[in-house]
């Protein structure tokens, strides 16, 4: 019997940013495919925000920590099963992330990534829930301090990140179908 395993490219490990993170097992070139993105596997359902009242507390915590929000609802994991989270769900946020999305919604390298480096992406590349707000712990030089579901609407943010935004947000941005664009403000970080 001849058994062939898929080459290991990424793995979980302890993170300085958020407890657990995803790390490169090999080096990646700019725009190189890293892993299947959330758009392909997890956009099968949209759970409306009105449904959240019927969901138990443990699941609500998982939704808050793992799911991407939209103005209408959130995108749950495949088969609505938080016991089946893939490695990619553990990619931490950084305002200067080294990962983005390609036109198919897969994770790709935004720049050269060295073996052993933590993979991070700016959650504003995917998050569009206008009520989303997260204090940032990334520590990058360009840290915005607070990440919101409206950051993607900022013209400067879009200019810098459009090619790496989740395809759904990229299409909305290119068509100009959003209102209330406000500049992203840098917030002084507490030390």
What spans do the regions from the language model cover?
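Catalytic cores of histone-lysine modification enzymes
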Residues: 2-99
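C-terminal SET catalytic tail plus cysteine-rich post-SET Zn-binding segment of SAM-dependent SET-domain
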Residues: 93-191
């Amino acid at each position: 019997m001849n058994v062939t395993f898929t080459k290991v490219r990424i793995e979980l490990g302890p993170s300085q940013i958020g407890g657990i993170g995803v790390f490169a097992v090999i080096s990646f070139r700019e725009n190189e495919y890293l892993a299947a993105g959330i758009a392909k596997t997890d956009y099968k359902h949209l759970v409306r925000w009105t449904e959240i009242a019927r969901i138990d507390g443990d699941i609500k915590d998982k939704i808050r920590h793992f799911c991407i929000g939209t103005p209408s609802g959130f995108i749950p994991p495949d088969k609505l099963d938080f016991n089946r989270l893939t490695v990619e769900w553990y990619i931490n946020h950084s305002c200067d992330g080294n990962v983005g999305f390609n036109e198919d919604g897969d994770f790709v390298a935004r720049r050269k990534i060295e073996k052993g480096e933590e993979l991070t992406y700016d959650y504003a590349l995917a998050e569009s829930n206008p009520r989303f707000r997260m204090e940032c712990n990334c520590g990058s030089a360009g840290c915005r301090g607070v990440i919101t579901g409206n950051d993607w609407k900022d013209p400067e943010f879009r200019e810098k990140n459009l090619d790496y935004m989740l395809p759904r947000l990229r299409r909305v941005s290119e068509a100009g179908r959003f209102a209330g664009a406000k500049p992203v403000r840098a917030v002084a970080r507490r030390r």
